[in-house]
Regions:
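Glycine-biased, small-residue-rich flexible motifs in mid-sequence functional cores and linkers
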Residues: 1-5, 74, 80-238
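Short, small/acidic-rich helices and loops at N termini and domain boundaries
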Residues: 1-86
């Protein structure tokens, strides 16, 4: 499934970036985002949301760049879910800086109508931490709870693997593109998640991991979760 407005929302994110509340403001202002995108500079200034720098970025980026990303998703069999789609999780619309676009591999569970718990923690987890992350992932999934985590080493991977062992639904929110081979040793886990849940990211499929993207994706993990279980964490952890 590729959203009918994917071209426009992808183009907007390429220009305005990610983790910005301007996405929320545009969503609230326009019933159909095509009106904004096709309105040109006059409309972009009239809406009152964008700075001169934002407008210059919109003018500099061609919509064909969004077309390339859409074609790539079609080739890879990924879904593109946008903020104005009916299947977009309502819980994500209610946060600061909602992601305009979700790239999805697998089937996004019904997060809005099912209990979901985030399980997070350090990449440098102790044996005790990884054991408990796995145990909680397994036990919660056995109770029909959707688990949500970030696919990183340590706590994240242990919780995902626990859910998979219980044949439960788990959602992995990545801080890179879903086609990027992040942590090759866990590719088997990511492949399994696409069969029993979903890999999701706000970044285009081949986007490499950059440090600031991981704290930013934490807002998505938190929003998708009715509660967050922190297994083990350092004082300065994101």
């Amino acid at each position: 499934m590729i959203s009918k407005n994917a071209r426009y929302w992808i183009w907007i994110t390429l220009a305005l970036g990610y983790n910005t509340d301007k996405i929320n403001k545009l969503y609230e202002l326009y019933t159909d985002i095509a009106e904004f995108c096709l309105g040109g500079e006059k409309e972009w200034r009239f809406c009152g949301v964008l700075s001169n720098g934002d407008i210059n970025k919109l003018k500099s980026i061609k919509k064909s760049e969004a077309d390339k990303i859409m074609k790539r998703c079609e080739e890879l069999g990924y879904s593109i879910v946008c903020i104005d789609d009916s299947v977009y999780p309502e819980c994500l619309r209610n946060i600061y800086a909602s992601p305009a676009v979700l790239y999805v591999s697998g089937d996004l569970p019904d997060i809005d109508n099912t209990l979901s718990i985030g399980i997070v923690g350090t990449r440098r987890a102790s044996n005790y931490g990884t054991h408990n992350a796995y145990k909680f992932g397994y036990a919660l999934s056995k109770c029909g709870v959707i688990t949500v985590s970030g696919g990183a080493l340590g706590v994240d991977c242990a919780s995902h693997r626990g859910s998979l062992a219980a044949k439960g639904k788990t959602v992995c929110v990545l801080g890179c593109g879903i086609n990027y081979n992040y942590l090759p040793q866990n590719k088997d886990m990511r492949d399994a998640i696409t069969n029993d849940g979903a890999l999701i990211s706000e970044y285009p499929p081949d986007t490499p991991p950059i440090g600031y993207q991981f704290p930013a994706r934490n807002r998505i993990i938190a929003a998708l979760s009715n509660g967050v279980l922190i297994i083990e964490s350092g004082i300065k952890s994101g």
